[in-house]
């Protein structure tokens, strides 16, 4: 793939938590090194101030800009932050038709995102930028089998508990 298509490396500021900071760097191209230790721009400056971003650049090129996230709109203040980052629309789990479609851990399944992305694309005549954030993959993953007839089974981990966690993840 690297020989045939654009490719590169992508480094994120956090793993396992702090999704909003990874989003911030991705959407703005700005490093968190310019902020205080432990600061979340979503929880501070972006609640009240706009910031140059990919959505603003694309809006200037005639795109409609949409954000979609299958979690609560107020988590990390996204309800007020996304307009300040240039998104025309923001659809959160509260507005998703299949909100009750949850995985065994209570997260809204990613399968609802496809319909929401299509709704965004169908809502305008212009080109669209749809920024979509998944929540389903959040852990802590179950340490006992909870899936009936999993499509993929996992073995080879040091413990059965880890096998179950990996099996649920994949």
What do these predicted ranges mean?
Residues 1-170:
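Solvent-exposed soluble domains appended to multi-pass membrane proteins
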């Amino acid at each position: 793939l690297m020989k045939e298509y654009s490719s590169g490396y992508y480094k994120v500021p956090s793993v396992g938590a702090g999704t909003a900071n990874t989003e911030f760097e991705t959407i703005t191209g700005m490093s968190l090194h310019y902020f205080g230790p432990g600061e979340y721009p979503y929880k501070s400056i972006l609640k009240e101030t706009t910031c140059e971003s990919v959505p603003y650049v694309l809006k200037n090129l005639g795109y409609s800009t949409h954000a979609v996230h299958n979690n609560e709109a107020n988590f990390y203040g996204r309800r007020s932050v996304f307009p300040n980052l240039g998104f025309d629309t923001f659809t959160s789990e509260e507005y998703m038709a299949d909100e009750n479609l949850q995985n065994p851990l209570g997260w809204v399944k990613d399968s609802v995102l496809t319909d929401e992305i299509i709704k965004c694309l169908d809502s305008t005549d212009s080109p669209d930028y749809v920024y979509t954030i998944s929540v389903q993959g959040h852990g802590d993953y179950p340490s006992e089998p909870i899936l009936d007839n999993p499509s993929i089974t996992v073995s080879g981990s040091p413990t059965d508990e880890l096998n179950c966690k990996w099996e649920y993840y994949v």
